Amino acid sequence: MAKVDTTERLAELRKLMKERNVDIYMVPSEDSHQSEYIAPCDARRGSAGYAVITHDKAALATDGRYFNQAEKQLDGNWELLKQGIQDVPTIQDWTADQVEGGKVVAVDPSVVTAADARKLADKIKKKGGEYKAVDDNLVDKIWSDRPSRPHEKVIVQPIEFSGKSFEDKIEDLRKELEKKKSLGFVVSMLDEIAWLFNLRGSDIPYNPVFFSYAVVTPTTVTLYVDDHKLPEEVKKHLGDKVTIRPYNAIFEELTTLSKEAFTKDKADATSKFLTSSRASWALNKALGGEDRVEETRSPVGDAKAVKNEVELEGMRQCHLRDGAALSEYFAWLEDQLINKKAELDEVDGADKLEAIRKKHDKFMGLSFDTISSTGANAAVIHYKPEKGECAVIDAKAIYLCDSGAQYRDGTTDTTRTVHFTEPTEMEKKAYTLVLKGNMALERVKFPKGTTGFALDSLARQFLWAEGLDYRHGTGHGVGSFLNVHEGPIGIGTRVQYSEVSLAVGNVVSDEPGYYEDGKFGIRIENMIMVKEVETSHKFGDKPYLGFEHVTMTPHCRNLVDMSLLGEDEKQFINDYHKEVYEKTSGYFEDDALTLKWLKRETAPY
């Protein structure tokens, strides 16, 4: 990963800032829909974080997943703010500290949430500065070769995979609106729109979504999407129940809708429009601001996170195919490195894995860039290998592969860490501690109402006992042929994970890890589904919940330190490996190499 020279870009941006009377400009990584993954046309900065530019300084704030990468890629123009580290200011505090003397801070209002804008405006005002919206994005103005906005076709996600009609989903949403006496809900998150209407797209790499907004009122449904993206099949699917309007018409029409709703003879003093708490400042302004808008956790997002039985079965089935693909890949890679002494780089590995996945039924693409990382690169949590710059896979070093795919019946995300020769004692110890944490989380039983925040330490406990830890969450929600990272649930120390309890039908990842910069990295990730479980008692007359694993890929026996495992843990691994073999070996009737590898890796301890 080479350093990126940003001197010329910063000079151009600062020139434009002076022309617009802007002293400080803020550049979030999200798009107008607060998407985590973005289209190339919205890639105004890197993977995750926040950039702030003044006339003589530039700062980048990011979290622990990207510290290593940022240090390698940032040039001397930038100050790196490692968020979450003691005594390091938040990007908001750093920005507020720059406004002395009445400086003007500006942002594109479409790429920040209304809630974040209010908080920062208040902070800046207290410091004597001004926070304002600049409707045209200044980075876009200097981006001479900015890619055009994608216009890919939308497809229908049929009920055989969705398990519920979009009409029924709309009616469920209207019941929520009725409870709140709301005038309507503006849906701005792309995965929520795709799920709500049983549609999928391909406007953002790896995410089967399409650029759109939707407005659902007690009597109308409007989908804001460019008409040329909708084939006849989609129009027939939507029928006359949904009005189609151009994507760019949303702001003007929201303003009109709000004005009409709040005329003196119509308005109920207590009624407001609902938006997601992640809706943009621009949307909030179009609706008339706080007096006319209630921001809430999205009822669509909440419903989407609870998979129905059809979606859950789809997740089970796609993980069988995906597990078979991963076993074939690891068997092939070991054979290439050990027996054939082949020289393969990290991209070669990622490309081979994608080719194997493509052979499987219902494959639609990858769910994110494959993290194919050898040795020290495995310590870069969100490493992305680049051809010509990446490392050759070293058979004598740890190899970490974090990968996933999109299938019509589900989304996968699996991490396995392997070693093809002789790992060090520390590598084996760290791997086994991570594996113990992975199992502890999967095996827990907990009362209904428990949050992912409360469960996080289960996965870290064995690392903590040795004074070790990892700088990322333990689990994230996963969509059904949708985004691989899905809210509102998760397992980790983020505040939002304490706000929503886990429920039957949730699908989350279980992915503790351990990383030593410059040496190696370890992560083990399974997908687990929340289910109701039997217990001897039911304290407080509450149902108790647990997890069902759906990932079907063996753990690396070469990295396990058996002396650190209890008998119950050994039995748990043996039972899991028996299940993996029974459910996936049938894929290898004509593949002796993979079948031999699978038998060895799933043999009892």
From Swiss-Prot:
Pfam family, one: Creatinase_N_2
Enzyme Commission code(s) on record: 3.4.11.9
Positions annotated to bind Mn(2+) 1: D413, E511, E525
Cofactor list: Mn(2+)
Biological processes per GO annotation: proteolysis
Signal peptide (UniProt feature, chain positions): none
Gene Ontology MF: a single term: metalloaminopeptidase activity
InterPro entries: Creatin/AminoP/Spt16_N (IPR029149), Creatinase/aminopeptidase-like (IPR036005), Creatinase_N (IPR000587), Pept_M24 (IPR000994), Pept_M24B (IPR033740), Peptidase_M24_C (IPR032416), Peptidase_M24B_aminopep-P_CS (IPR001131), X-Pro_aminopeptidase_P (IPR050422)
Residues annotated for Mn(2+) 2 binding in this entry: D402, D413, E525
Keywords for this protein: Aminopeptidase, Hydrolase, Manganese, Metal-binding, Metalloprotease, Protease
Reaction catalysis annotation: Release of any N-terminal amino acid, including proline, that is linked to proline, even from a dipeptide or tripeptide
One Gene Ontology term, aspect cellular component: cytoplasm
Keyword Protein biosynthesis belongs to the record: no
Cofactor note: Binds 2 manganese ions per subunit.
Keyword Manganese found: yes
Recorded superkingdom: Eukaryota
Family: Belongs to the peptidase M24B family.
Record function comment: Catalyzes the removal of a penultimate prolyl residue from the N-termini of peptides.
Protein name per Swiss-Prot or TrEMBL: Probable Xaa-Pro aminopeptidase P
Species name: Leptosphaeria maculans (strain JN3 / isolate v23.1.3 / race Av1-4-5-6-7-8) (Blackleg fungus)
